[in-house]
């Protein structure tokens, strides 16, 4: 089929002939190849792809084939279904098998199915995040933004489809997974037979994802730090290119700062992070003013340059944006302020290194603060006294490499004498100890499943609200790498 560029006239003709559902499908199918493109409609999408040299008659035919507009293949592109199918068998595709799979699943669901799926994912996306009248593809996009669904991460979707008794669609997912694993196995075999083969690819991309820092958010957030959607990059890297991993070899791995204003979980938090290889710095029951001094002191420590990471555990009364010391000052201490003190600008010795935050706050019922978005607070950065020299020629974004796990629960949990330990911190410790050689993000997804399971068996007042936001650029494993 012709690889020649597509004229504006042809793009206009195609766009005029598509209905709204077909336009939605085409925009969805192209999400992997439209990184950094703001394409609000199909015409702009196709025009942008054409300008980038990614749209030819062959790729446009592929898109029309995927949305089943075989009539337009013949009328506008002067080709037919059989010719397109033959071309796809012999040539690389514009659209990933992953996108095709999700589109086909969406076509097989009726509105009741979609409504049930939206309901089942509320504990992951946040209640009210996705309107009930949204389509399946809208739901998928939201789950992708939260990093709950990806080409290699379909467990949540399988679980939800099983709950609505659509086992037939799970079969499609299983076939896709087996096919992907088979392709990866074949590629690894090929690479093993060619040990001197040098593979070059865009250094901004690792495992199909952009290395530019963007906050991946699990759970609802009313404000968004970065407007760009979190999604798979436009480049499809060979499956055998391994994702880059953070260096975690220093002894200790880094300082683990524990500020505990409650005291119920201190012992096993110390044991957990000590077992991971961190040097523990514990502060029990500090006042709010003391917290400020503690955080400033550790943000300016020169020792960070000798370590590969930093961890911080905060346990207190508070909400999703602040914590209180022993004196319970009403305004509390800003969690954004804590995060900003350890960014690459204010703590250069930690630039490019993972900075982990695990937060358990207890709040009065109904007093939850505005939202749990992790945002930059410029003025607060200026208050830090740290003055290390800025590294030269550093290209790492200052907000990169942050892992922010925040759990809130009702303060009534602390009134139970026999079970006042945090379910979140207990299960977090178990996950970190048992799965230390697995990626931290994967462990946290499983942690969210466990907290969800707990929530499903208790009253609303006993439930935990857990969210994860991160700007990790590489795979993070809390073990020597």
UniProtKB/Swiss-Prot annotation:
It comes from Mus musculus (Mouse). Highly expressed in heart. This is CASP8 and FADD-like apoptosis regulator. GO terms for biological process: apoptotic process; necroptotic process; negative regulation of apoptotic process; negative regulation of extrinsic apoptotic signaling pathway; negative regulation of extrinsic apoptotic signaling pathway via death domain receptors; negative regulation of myoblast fusion; negative regulation of necroptotic process; proteolysis. It holds the Pfam family Peptidase_C14. Belongs to the peptidase C14A family. GO terms for cellular component: cytoplasm. Residues 6-307 are annotated as: Interaction with CASP8 propeptide. Residues 197-481 are annotated as: Interaction with TRAF1 and TRAF2. The record marks 371-372, 377-378 as: Cleavage. Keywords: Apoptosis, Repeat. The gene is Cflar. Disulfide bonds: none annotated. It comes from the Eukaryota. Residues 197-436 are annotated as: Interaction with CASP3. PROSITE patterns: CASPASE_P20, DED.
């Amino acid at each position: 089929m012709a690889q020649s560029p597509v004229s504006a006239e042809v793009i206009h003709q195609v766009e005029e002939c598509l209905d709204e559902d077909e336009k939605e499908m085409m925009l969805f199918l192209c999400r992997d190849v439209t990184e950094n493109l703001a394409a609000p409609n199909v015409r702009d999408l196709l025009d942008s792809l054409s300008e980038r040299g990614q749209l030819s008659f062959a790729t446009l035919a592929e898109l029309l084939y995927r949305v089943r507009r075989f009539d337009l293949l013949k009328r506008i592109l002067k080709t037919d279904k059989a010719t397109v199918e033959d071309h796809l068998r012999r040539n690389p595709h514009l659209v990933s098998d992953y996108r095709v799979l999700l589109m086909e699943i969406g076509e097989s669901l009726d509105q009741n199915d979609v409504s049930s799926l939206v309901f089942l994912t509320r504990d992951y996306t946040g209640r009210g995040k996705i309107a009930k009248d949204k389509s399946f593809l809208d739901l998928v996009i939201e789950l992708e933004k939260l990093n709950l669904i990806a080409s290699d991460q379909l467990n949540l979707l399988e679980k939800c489809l099983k709950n609505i008794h659509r086992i037939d669609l799970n079969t499609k997912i299983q076939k896709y997974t087996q096919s992907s694993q088979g392709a990866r196995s074949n590629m690894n075999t090929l690479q093993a037979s060619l040990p001197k083969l040098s593979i070059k690819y865009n250094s901004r991309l690792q495992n199909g994802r952009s290395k530019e820092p963007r906050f991946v958010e699990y759970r609802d957030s009313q404000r968004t730090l970065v407007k760009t959607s979190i999604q798979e990059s436009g480049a499809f890297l060979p499956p055998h290119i391994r994702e880059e991993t953070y260096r975690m070899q220093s002894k200790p791995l880094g300082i683990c700062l524990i500020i505990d204003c409650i005291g119920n979980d201190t012992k096993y938090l110390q044991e957990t992070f000590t077992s991971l290889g961190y040097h523990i710095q514990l502060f029990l029951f500090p006042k709010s003013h003391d917290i400020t001094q503690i955080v400033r002191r550790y943000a300016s420590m020169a020792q960070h340059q000798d370590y590969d990471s930093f961890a911080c555990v905060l346990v207190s009364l508070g909400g999703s944006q602040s914590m209180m010391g022993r004196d319970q000052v009403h305004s509390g201490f800003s969690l954004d302020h804590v995060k900003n003190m350890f960014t690459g600008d204010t703590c250069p010795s930690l630039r490019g290194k993972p900075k982990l935050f695990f937060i358990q706050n207890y709040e009065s019922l109904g007093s939850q603060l505005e939202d749990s978005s992790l945002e930059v607070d410029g003025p607060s950065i200026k208050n830090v006294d740290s003055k290390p020299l800025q590294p030269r020629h550093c290209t790492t974004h200052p907000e990169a490499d942050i892992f922010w796990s925040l759990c809130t629960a009702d303060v009534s949990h602390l009134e139970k004498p026999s079970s006042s330990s945090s379910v979140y911190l207990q299960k977090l410790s178990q996950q970190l100890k048992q799965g230390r050689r697995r990626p931290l993000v994967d462990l946290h997804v499983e942690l969210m499943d466990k907290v969800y399971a707990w929530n499903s068996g208790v009253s609303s007042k006993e439930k935990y609200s857990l969210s994860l936001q991160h700007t990790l650029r590489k795979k993070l494993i809390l073990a020597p790498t």
